[in-house]
Amino acid sequence: PFDHRSTFEKAGFEDISRVKQIIYEAFKKSLDTVENGAILIDEEYGDEILRDAKDKGYTTLLTTEKSGQEDFVFEYGDDFAVHIEKYNPDFAKVLIKVETEISDLTKTNLKKLNDYCHSTSLKLLIEIVSGGNLDLILKTISELQHAGIDPDVWKVEGMENEFAYEQIVQEAR
């Protein structure tokens, strides 16, 4: 629920951090144990939430991409590692939009993030947004793996049937 920076901004919310804090408070009340909860949020509007969630023992995922971009570019450019280390999340997360193929810029930045995560034992989650195009998801996973990009988690959109998920799992192995 927290990975929608541009949506909040376009909706004209004046105090996005406050809205996210309200959502976070409801999130905490809805869980019986911290082991069942994970927070995915950005640094800009979620600084206090990230710190509190980490202190309370929730799994934390920090967004790394600049919201609303066609290609994956780091929110904080070459200083991305400094911003990740500031929060010490369990996962670095990146969303990539794929309509036909992955741009060289996206691949280069994904490789940087992948190598950083592997060198620091930080887990990496890559979310592929393709409009639910199974063939494109499979092609993207294959292409990224051949480029040496190996996240801990591939996050994909909902698929039509179980067979589609089986194909994704097979490709990701």
Enumerate the predicted regions with their spans.
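A structural motif corresponding to the C-terminal end of an alpha-helix
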Residues: A26-G37, Y87-N88, C117-L122, L144-D152
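Catalytic beta/alpha-barrel core
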Residues: A38-E43, D90-T106, T140-A164
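Conserved anion-binding
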Residues: I96-E99, T106-I149
